[in-house]
């Protein structure tokens, strides 16, 4: 929800009406009478029905395939009072918003979730947690050599070293990191071209295949680069980009946001080789203590390279003590919808496998 990342996507990534919840001070400038209060909380959200569109409406913190986290931005100072104010304000009858809040894809052990839960419990508000999955993460407390020695078997380490050596025999193989705004701008265009040449381009799911997604990605990444909050890692072969990885950084944390590789070289696993180099960089960077893969729980590459996981869950909060039934129903609808989607995906994948065999 970093403003430089989220705001470019509000009107470009979702057909729904995405609104912006802000809590700020009401201090005024005596000369201009303009409100100059600091923002204490920011959260994009949608108003919708949970799961299969059954039951009362909910306030859902906005998540999307390009922002898989529903944690609102909360000012650390007086954070408990801020959340208490949010709950009590939404509970007012004069506020024309649903009275059930849903925070999807939030770390169950994170400080924000602990805060949201503790304030709710302290006020006797009903809560539920559902749709818990494990996401690959990286705790950067080891050096890279020790980490890979423990994370990968000797067979896999030798295999990846062999692939890197064989790829280097085809030309001048280089690992590069774009960090300055100008370098990031150029590397971003190379990423978009590389991703669009692969299967995502064929299925029209690449960033560049949709002008709104492309505009969002360019603006968001270039905005972050202006504040030194973006790195684009790349493998190049004779000067041509064959794998690219966009990493977002904030304070001492990193997110491996998007990756693409040259599918004509898939036998060398350039995407995996790049992720290994990027992992080494993250582990050896004293300014990074934690990295989020932003990956699905069963991601074939990240679950192998990053052996640690973090529980990601959906937190449901009712802003009135009498809403326990509504909270329970919303949580069960969300869980049922998730299970049904996963089952449909498994069936679709099996059908595709059967068709390919024929």
Per-region residue spans from a language model:
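Residue-level detector of flexible, active-site-proximal loop/helix-junction positions
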Residues: 134, 182, 298, 319-322
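Short beta-strand-to-coil "C-cap" segments at the C-terminal boundary of structured domains/repeats
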Residues: 139-140, 317-321
């Amino acid at each position: 929800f970093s403003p430089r990342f989220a705001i470019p996507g509000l009107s470009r990534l979702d057909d729904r009406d995405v609104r912006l919840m802000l809590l700020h001070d009401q201090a005024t400038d005596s000369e201009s009478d303009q409100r100059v209060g600091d923002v204490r909380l920011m959260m994009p959200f949608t108003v919708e029905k949970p799961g299969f569109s059954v039951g009362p409406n909910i306030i859902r913190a906005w998540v999307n395939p390009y922002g898989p986290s529903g944690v609102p931005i909360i000012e650390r100072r007086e954070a408990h009072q801020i959340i208490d104010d949010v709950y009590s304000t939404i509970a007012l009858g004069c506020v024309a918003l649903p009275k059930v809040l849903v925070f999807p894809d939030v770390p169950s052990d994170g400080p924000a979730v602990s805060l949201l839960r503790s304030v709710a419990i302290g006020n006797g508000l009903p809560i539920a947690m559902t749709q818990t999955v494990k996401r690959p993460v990286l705790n950067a407390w080891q050096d890279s050599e020790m980490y890979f020695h423990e994370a990968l078997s000797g067979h896999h380490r030798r295999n990846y070293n062999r692939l890197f050596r064989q790829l280097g025999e085809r030309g001048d193989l280089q690992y590069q990191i774009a960090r300055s705004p100008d370098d990031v701008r150029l590397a971003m265009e190379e990423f978009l071209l590389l991703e669009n040449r692969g299967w995502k381009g064929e299925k029209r799911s690449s960033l560049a295949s949709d002008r709104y997604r492309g505009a969002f990605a360019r603006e968001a990444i270039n905005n972050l680069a202006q504040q030194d909050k973006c790195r684009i890692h790349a493998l190049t072969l004779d000067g041509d980009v064959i794998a690219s990885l966009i990493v977002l950084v904030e304070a001492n944390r990193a997110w491996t946001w998007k990756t693409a590789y040259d599918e004509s070289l898939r036998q060398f696993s350039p995407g995996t080789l790049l992720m290994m180099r990027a992992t080494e960089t993250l582990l050896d960077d004293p300014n990074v203590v934690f990295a989020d893969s932003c990956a699905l729980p069963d991601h074939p590459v990240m679950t192998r390279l990053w052996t640690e996981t973090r529980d990601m869950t959906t937190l449901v909060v009712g802003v009135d003590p009498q809403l326990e039934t509504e909270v329970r129903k919303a949580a069960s609808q969300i869980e049922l919808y998730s299970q049904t989607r996963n089952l449909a995906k498994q069936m679709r994948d099996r059908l595709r496998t059967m068709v390919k065999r024929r």
